[in-house]
């Protein structure tokens, strides 16, 4: 509950800021206080940047990653392997894989996962577009990189069922013990996946 000691305009800003992920009322209040201390020029530049973000950023027409053009820079890059499509839940997942530098194919962002309890079904995701894209582009391999949550696993199995009759190799990213990790602190699910996904040494 926002303090009644602030003017209504500030209360409204704090309330709106506290809706952002990772921000509670205290953090939102600190940000609001900081905004008041900023120069008018800096505050207006920030407001302009938010307006630009909302008006110019859209999703790539091919993979549904964020972009300010018709296609994102990854889809437009001729050096990328067009035969591989890595399927991820969100743009944040795409960026995590990109930062690893371990993948040089293209992506497909589902924009979520199957979540029946939240009324999210196949028609709410970019699954139809994925199937059309595989057929249109003649992909050799689809790498399913959904998260190892129950929803991510359900989505992966649903995709596998749809893709099994298509002429495309389907793989799932491996999960295991992180580098520097300690087995005694690793959860049962991760240990099970690591053991099932073991490789010859």
From Swiss-Prot:
Report which superkingdom the organism of origin falls in.
Bacteria
Enumerate the SUPFAM superfamilies for this protein. Answer: Recombination protein RecR
Question: Which keywords does the record carry?
Answer: DNA damage, DNA recombination, DNA repair, Metal-binding, Zinc, Zinc-finger
Q: Which GO terms describe its molecular function?
A: DNA binding; zinc ion binding
Instruction: Cite the InterPro entries for this sequence.
Output: DNA_Rcmb_RecR (IPR000093), Rcmb_RecR (IPR023627), Rcmb_RecR_Znf (IPR015967), TOPRIM_dom (IPR006171), TOPRIM_RecR (IPR034137)
State the signal peptide span: none
> Which intervals hold the zinc fingers (C4-type)?
60-75
Biological process terms from the Gene Ontology for this record are: DNA recombination; DNA repair
Give the matching PROSITE patterns: RECR, TOPRIM
Pfam families, sorted: RecR_C, RecR_HhH, RecR_ZnF, Toprim_4
**Limits of the Toprim domain:** 83-178
Q: Which family does it belong to?
A: Belongs to the RecR family.
What does the record give as the function of this protein?
Answer: May play a role in DNA repair. It seems to be involved in an RecBC-independent recombinational process of DNA repair. It may act with RecF and RecO.
HAMAP family assigned to the protein according to its UniProt record, in alphabetical order: RecR (MF_00017)
What protein does this entry describe?
Recombination protein RecR
Q: Which organism is it from?
A: Syntrophobacter fumaroxidans (strain DSM 10017 / MPOB)
